[in-house]
Amino acid sequence: MPSISININLAFAAALLGMLMFRSHMMSSLLCLEGMMLSMFTLSTLTILNMQFTMSFTMPILLLVFAACEAAIGLALLVMVSNNYGLDYIQNLNLLQC
């Protein structure tokens, strides 16, 4: 395995570890989720270019589209929660209330 792939896998693992450690704040969780998506995009792009899969060149672009949608929805939820509650603590939210 080349050193670039090892570094990208380590970046994914670090973002996953950050997601598990800093799950009490919504902003930290969103940043770690974006780091995971960025490392997945880079790894999938490198894999497709190295293996020369001509039929799956659109897969990294599709992954970026889903990452952008996830970021937009996450930021909208963050703004809504911070406007309503004044905090981004996930423990203070009761998601069962309407």
From Swiss-Prot:
The protein's name is NADH-ubiquinone oxidoreductase chain 4L
Decide whether keyword Glycosyltransferase is in the record.
no
**Where is coiled-coil annotated?**
none
Write down the top EC class of this protein: translocase
Q: How does it sit in the membrane?
A: Multi-pass membrane protein
Q: Which residues cross the membrane?
A: 2-22, 29-49, 61-81
Q: Which InterPro entries match?
A: NADH_UbQ_OxRdtase_chain4L/K, NUOK/Mnh_C1-like
List GO terms (cellular component aspect): mitochondrial inner membrane; respiratory chain complex I
From the Swiss-Prot or TrEMBL record, what is one GO molecular function term?
NADH dehydrogenase (ubiquinone) activity
Tell me what organism the protein belongs to.
Microcebus mittermeieri
Q: Which family does it belong to?
A: Belongs to the complex I subunit 4L family.
| Chief location | mitochondrion
Quaternary structure note: Core subunit of respiratory chain NADH dehydrogenase (Complex I) which is composed of 45 different subunits.
**Assigned keywords, A-Z:** Electron transport, Membrane, Mitochondrion, Mitochondrion inner membrane, NAD, Respiratory chain, Translocase, Transmembrane, Transmembrane helix, Transport, Ubiquinone
Biological process terms in GO annotation: ATP synthesis coupled electron transport
Enzyme Commission no: 7.1.1.2
Where in the cell? Mitochondrion inner membrane
